[in-house]
Amino acid sequence: MPWDSASTDTQTTTVATTQTNSSVVNTSSVTTDETEGDISIELDEEDTTTSYNESEASKIELTQTSATVTGSGVTVDGSKVTITSAGTYVISGTLTDGCIDVNVSGKGTVRIILNGVNVTSSTTAPFIVEDAKKVVVTLADGTTNTFTDSTRATTDDEDYSAAITSKADLTFNGNG
């Protein structure tokens, strides 16, 4: 069922759209005509493709309270996993009371493949996009991926009211 939310205070709003026939969710800034209420969302091939080159991807295995990384572009500090470079990342496993944070300055797309992920957090959103040009998350076929947060998480800098939060273009695709 498609849904959207839009602010009436400005012409630039945040919209989330779900297309059940292709399992695509896109969150992006769009322009609306408040008089007409029209919303325009454009998806490109990068937003809808679920394929990736596994040999070029960094692997992140969540291990309850930390993570093991094979590849580059990732830092791990306890239960906080931070993606720091554009590229492709395959994530699997369970992270208890931690978060996956995307903090990439500059150009390029961050492609994240969720391959059986379960992340919980009592202190912050378990999936945060702080900075990136674009993030595309693919839900691997046949997997269950879960992000669970506390009722409302607050850090020194941010107040998160959702399990998944983004300050950049964020697209979900796939059938997992």
Annotate each PLM feature.
Residues M1-G176:
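A composition-driven surface/loop motif
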